[in-house]
Regions:
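Short beta-strand segments
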Residues: 23-24, 84-85, 116-118, 176-178
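Secondary-structure boundary elements
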Residues: 103-114, 166-171, 199-203
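A conserved C-terminal secondary-structure "cap"
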Residues: 183-237
Length: 237
């Protein structure tokens, strides 16, 4: 349906052939959004495109005095890595559309794997677990020293990515990050950054800056969420 359409507008050259796409959409906690934002700030990513939809709330994120779309694609063409970054927590009705958009874009760009993550309730520890859509993707987890989970429930965009990718024969990896806090904590975000760097050689987070950055990014995401809710309440009264 047209009203569900999400589209990508590329504004700079993007080359991620045989590379990696990282999903930073917050659909189950915002730890992934904070980690990917920190990674973008550390690993020489540049803006590659914007992600937009008539279903997205009309909002601009002002950073360093300049307006920004709330959902964007950042790319490091040297590393062949693209990051879907978002300050929006998408409505559940858009999760399937967003996941399929990512998979279609992977096929169009001839990338090799999507890496996503979710936050699961549990004691915050150093180990992060993983699930995957194919045997090949599970092999990537094993090679990176990440324990593969045999039984789990994966909600949201990450869950749709796994199911759709299994049918299409596309490699998708979802990392399960444990946290015992309602909101993201520094340790969980740090653990995710470290694990992503194992799966995606060359990317990194500056852990010294991460604690300070994570609080700022979290506040920005929460503010965008609050402003979005206020807009929705006023629009649909």
């Amino acid at each position: 349906m047209m009203e569900n359409e999400i589209h990508i507008k590329e504004i700079n050259p993007i080359n991620v052939e045989n590379g990696v796409i990282i999903n930073g959409f917050p659909s189950s906690g915002i730890t992934s959004a904070i980690a990917t934002e920190s990674m973008i700030n550390t690993s020489n990513f540049e803006l590659g495109g914007i992600i937009d939809s008539d279903r997205f709330p009309p909002i601009s994120i002002i950073k360093n005095g300049e307006p920004n779309y709330p959902a964007r694609i950042f790319v490091n063409n040297d590393l062949k890595v693209a990051v879907f970054s978002s300050y929006l927590t998408l409505d559940v009705s858009l999760h399937r559309t967003a996941a399929r958009l990512m998979l279609d874009w992977l096929q169009d760009k001839k990338a090799s794997v999507i890496v996503s993550s979710i936050t699961v309730k549990g004691t915050t520890g150093t180990e992060i677990f993983g699930v995957a859509s194919t045997g090949n993707a599970r092999g990537k987890l094993v090679n990176a020293g990440i324990t593969v989970v045999e039984n789990a429930t994966v909600p949201g965009i990450s869950g749709v990515l796994l199911n759709e990718a299994m049918l299409r024969g596309i490699d998708v990896i979802v990392l399960l990050v444990s946290s015992d806090k309602e909101f993201p904590d520094f340790q969980a975000t740090s653990n995710l950054c470290t694990t992503l760097s194992k799966l995606v050689p060359g990317v990194s987070c500056n852990l010294d800056k991460l604690e300070k950055e994570s609080k700022i990014i979290e506040e920005q995401i929460k503010q965008a969420e609050t402003d979005t809710k206020d807009l929705s309440d006023n629009m649909y009264r």
